[in-house]
From Swiss-Prot:
Subcellular location: Cytoplasm; Nucleus; Endoplasmic reticulum
The keyword Transcription regulation is assigned to this record: no
Protein name, as recorded: Serine/threonine-protein kinase Sgk1-A
Region annotated Disordered, chain positions: 66-94
EC number: 2.7.11.1
């Protein structure tokens, strides 16, 4: 079977075998994207078939799972059970409990739990509820990251392109984040369907993403995990960033950090080199996402992860001629391997904002959502789940998620020396409910 396709250069022949190869490439790409970075790297590192790879790349692959110094448990004894470790103290929202909600559908999954569509029994509003298993968090010593995510969420209420936290609470076994419900679908989902976007649409999304990143940077927060899976579209088509588990707080304008974390396709060269890095890693990721929106795959993508890492470190950026000069210039600046020469290295978001590629954007109108999005997800209401993966929505909701007998609710009377999730529960000031 042969298919004829017309291109700017004329007619070309696309064989069936080539089509199968392209499909296989995309399927492999999507599967790898769903795998956790640590687990994936460990699988690669222990695979003898990579023994002959360049030493530079091999040194990257042969690492143990990264941990921040502050995440290391100084006490070598087994951790207490979750119920013993928690102390809510003077909880701001002592009355919130799982049975306040009707849990309707599973709409996502992560390393430590699920995200569910839920309706509050009292006000009948819809929320996305992120439910995390304490046991899994404590086992991997990720409690500081979870608390960091909560802290970042509390600061998001002032920005239109960051998902907001309404309140949080916990039981002996689970943590509950009550978040904005966003049902326009992941950017990843829409890229899967459409392969790539026209430049005006990509510019609109990149501008809203850059605005959100700039706001986080103004709070001395580095996002570190920008990728299409973490970028949602709301019901009107505006961008909403979510998943702040890898955010790093307290990074001053000239400050650095060194934790090896992120998603393979979007790791900046300095992260792969295991060098100290700064907030410019977010601008590298913005460049990678913009490239993917325009071309359909990340800039240095390969099915072979070792080869992809080598590409990120050493291969020159290749740009096809079907984009404008301003887009080309921005991509070259964002995907600059030397972070000191990267766009954003000197004046952070202001450099991105003032780039000629964004000259059609009125930034005041953008932040006030006065610009009509180039794409409308056309959702009929909160119960419209057309943009969620059926793999999630068709799974039954566990009954235990919505159960909250008095005996398992954490109260302020529980006091232990090791307080892993102290202060997790949160409720906004009373006037926020009015």
């Amino acid at each position: 079977m042969t298919v004829k396709t017309e291109t700017a250069a004329g007619a070309s022949t696309l064989t069936y075998s080539k089509m199968r190869g392209m499909v296989a490439l995309l399927i492999a790409f999507m599967k790898q994207r769903r795998m956790g970075l640590n687990d994936f790297i460990q699988k690669i590192a222990t695979n003898s078939s990579y023994a002959c790879k360049p030493s530079e790349v091999q040194s990257i692959l042969n690492i143990s799972p990264p941990q921040e110094p502050e995440l290391l448990n100084e006490n070598s004894s087994p951790p207490p059970s979750p119920s013993q470790q928690i102390n809510l103290g003077p909880s701001s929202n002592p009355h919130a409990k799982p049975s306040d909600f009707q849990f309707l559908k599973i709409i996502g999954k992560g390393s430590f739990g699920k995200v569910l569509l839920a309706r509050h029994q009292a006000d009948e509003k819809f929320y996305a509820v992120k439910v995390l298993q304490k046991k899994a968090i404590l086992k991997k010593k990720e409690e500081k990251h979870i608390m960091s995510e909560r802290n970042v969420l509390l600061k998001n209420v002032k920005h239109p392109f960051l998902v907001g936290l309404h309140f949080s609470f916990q039981t002996t076994s689970r943590l509950y984040f009550i978040l904005d419900y966003i049902n326009g679908g992941e950017l990843f989902y829409h890229l899967q369907r459409e392969r790539c976007f026209l430049e005006p649409r990509a510019r609109f999304y990149a501008a809203e993403i850059a605005s959100a990143l700039g706001y986080l940077h103004s709070l001395n927060i580095v996002y570190r995990d920008l990728k299409p899976e973490n970028i949602l579209l709301d019901s009107q088509g505006h961008i909403v960033l979510t998943d702040f588990g890898l955010c790093k707080e307290n990074i001053e304008p000239n400050g650095t950090t060194s934790t090896f974390c992120g998603t393979p396709e979007y790791l900046a060269p300095e992260v792969l080199h295991k060098q100290p890095y700064d907030r410019t890693v977010d601008w590298w990721c913005l460049g990678a996402v913009l490239y993917e929106m325009l071309y359909g795959l990340p800039p240095f993508y390969s099915r072979n992860t070792a080869e992809m890492y080598d590409n990120i470190l050493n291969k020159p950026l290749q740009l096809k001629p079907n984009i404008t000069n301003s887009a080309r210039n921005l991509l070259e600046g964002l995907l600059q391997k030397d972070r000191t020469k990267r766009i954003g290295a000197k004046n952070d978001f202001m450099e991105i904002k003032n780039h000629i590629f964004f000259s059609p954007i009125n930034w005041d109108d953008l932040i006030n959502k006065k610009i009509t999005p180039p794409f409308n997800p056309n959702v009929s209401g909160p119960s419209d789940l057309q943009h969620f993966d059926p793999e999630f929505t068709e799974e039954p909701v566990p009954n235990s998620i919505g159960q909250s007998p008095d005996s398992i609710l954490i109260t302020a009377s529980i006091k232990e020396a090791a307080e892993a999730f102290m202060g997790f529960s949160y409720a906004p000031p009373m006037e926020s409910y009015l």
